[in-house]
Amino acid sequence: MTDTLPTVSRRGLMLVMSSPSGAGKTTISRALLERDPAIGMSVSATTRAPRPGEVDGKDYHFVTVEKFHEMVEKREFLEHARVFDNFYGTPRGPVDEILRSGRDVLFDIDWQGTQQMAQNARADLVSVFVLPPSVEELERRLRGRAQDSDEVVRKRMAKAGDEMSHWPEYDYIVVNIDLDKSIAAVQAILAAERLKRERQVGLPDFVTQLRGGE
């Protein structure tokens, strides 16, 4: 057996967080980004104009409508959608580069985007759906934010039912009763998924060397 064993590295993963508005996915996502240096937020491409202070390549990849359609035709997006008069999408290239480096990418997207990503990159995808403990609590949280009108809250509540119907399409479900416990649950999911053998690059050669080169 040689003194030097082959290096085992890890391929990164794509962590998708989805939930109805007010269930807590954004708060959980922010906590993950603050506490875990091995994961970063995905950067979307968009056709909308940059807002004051936004930096191209950091906040968004700003592209023309023509360029966006060209990228769609070339299948360069993991997922894409039209939102009102603008287009948004997740470029495949930058994400693949991050995954190869062993870092993870966090996505805050809805069930439709998750379906597209499952079709385009299932092996790298880990999806988590965050549920509220009750409909009453969901409405209380929405109203507690004090940033939406009664009409907007009603629309969000009406949309929540459809969004929650897609829970069986996700790998993991977290019922957000206690925020700290929910954050810990997602951290545990990440820890386990990172150790899956299919994400360990170089593992077969490593084990072969351990067994004496058989």
Swiss-Prot record:
GO terms for molecular function: ATP binding; guanylate kinase activity. Belongs to the guanylate kinase family. ATP binds at S19, P20, S21, G22, A23, G24, K25, T26. Keywords: ATP-binding, Cytoplasm, Kinase, Nucleotide-binding, Transferase. NCBIfam families: guanyl_kin. SUPFAM superfamilies: P-loop containing nucleoside triphosphate hydrolases (SSF52540). This is Guanylate kinase. Essential for recycling GMP and indirectly, cGMP. It holds the Pfam family Guanylate_kin. It is found in: Cytoplasm.
